[in-house]
Amino acid sequence: MANDYISFVFKSLLLLIHLVFLGQHHVDSASVVKSLPGFEGPLPFELETGYIGVGEEEEVQLFYYFIKSERNPKEDPLLLWLTGGPGCSAISGLLYENGPLTMKLDVYNGTLPSLVSTTYSWTKNSSMIFLDQPVGTGFSYSRTELFNKPSDTGEAKRIHEFLQKWLGKHQEFSSNPFYVGGDSYSGITVPATVQEISKGNYQCCKPPINLQGYMLGNPITDSKIDGNSQIPYAHGMALISDELYESLKRICKGEYEHVDPYNTECLKLLEEFNECTSKLYRSHILYPLCEMTNPDCYIYRYSLSHYWVNDETVRKALQINKESIREWKRCDWSKPYTKDIISSVPYHMNNSINGYRSLIFSGDHDFEVPLIGTQVWIKSLNYAIVDKWRPWMINNQVAGYTRTYANKMTFATVKGGGHTAEYKPDETFIMFQRWINGQALYGKVKLLQKTE
């Protein structure tokens, strides 16, 4: 009897320890952040950070930054922003593209870098969730290696689950018009996530997410289309000669991505092409190609966020879970990731059929994902043109060019823009503001709500 009692007590203690462990690890956390190290005074906006667990046992903990709209959070749209990569932190969007703060561009001297307010934050008229995804990015993490191997389709499902749980804890935003946005590799993730949300709204999940549409900047969409557009783009921007371009077209027959290894003449021409373009900064061809350690280099600003985020006072202010403590990287390319969506064009087609609005925009000096390729896959959708190609203006100056289609898709270029919104943040903000408010970029007012 005594042994049975001891065994019972021992098992009870093990169960209690297990329950405590689960309680510590499976309770989602959220914290209101009133101030941040490096920023002078209280934050002039409402910031919340936290983790949402996804998976059967919430093995994956996704970290987010949530900023309420500065205009009317009760009614303004709610936007989920997904940074590209895959493997680039939400901080990239928040501090460099469309958030209310950015790094002050001072040379690092060993002290904590400073933050300053921006004038172009999309949170002026929308509430925004900046999400660290896929798992292993930023401060998101998995408790087991089994769940630390993300994929395109798997992340779309995780993001959908994240949204369901997040909205369950923030029910005051459940009726707000909801959008998903991103850039670069998010051209794969966002359309898949939109389709996953749409499918969930019809099949399983109540209350449904009030999904209205999505937006993408310089989106990676189809590796073949994107890759094959770089040579005609280079010719159009006078990066290669007419003679080289004509030879490439004739000898390679328009196929520059998957070249026949026996077509040695084509391979030699591609070497010549690379000689002409390899020294360019591909995210914006007018910017110099230089090292991140050089304070005069554009990308030096990225090193400042590395110093800032890895400071212990910043991690404490952001309420970072100790399980995810490690060296933070703005973009971590070393993580395993399965690219199981070859082309997101079918997802765009399905989302159009379901009636969702979309804004696709391209910085016209991006060599990574040239606007020519984006126009090719948009054309492949075979939707009628509603509004012809025309300039969109800011203060009577051309800010880019735009065209709209019968599937509620708007395409726009950003004049002087690069691979992400950060190269023309003011212009991109005005473009976003017009579109999210239901206006055509050139001024006509249109209905905002998706019709059922």
UniProtKB/Swiss-Prot annotation:
Its main location: secreted. GO terms for cellular component: extracellular region. Disulfide bonds join 88-331, 252-266, 290-297. This is Serine carboxypeptidase-like 6. Its EC number is 3.4.16.-. SUPFAM superfamilies: alpha/beta-Hydrolases. One of its GO terms (biological process) is proteolysis. GO terms for molecular function: serine-type carboxypeptidase activity. Residues 1-29 form the signal peptide. The active site is at residues 184, 366, 419. Gene3D superfamilies: alpha/beta hydrolase. Belongs to the peptidase S10 family. It comes from Arabidopsis thaliana (Mouse-ear cress).
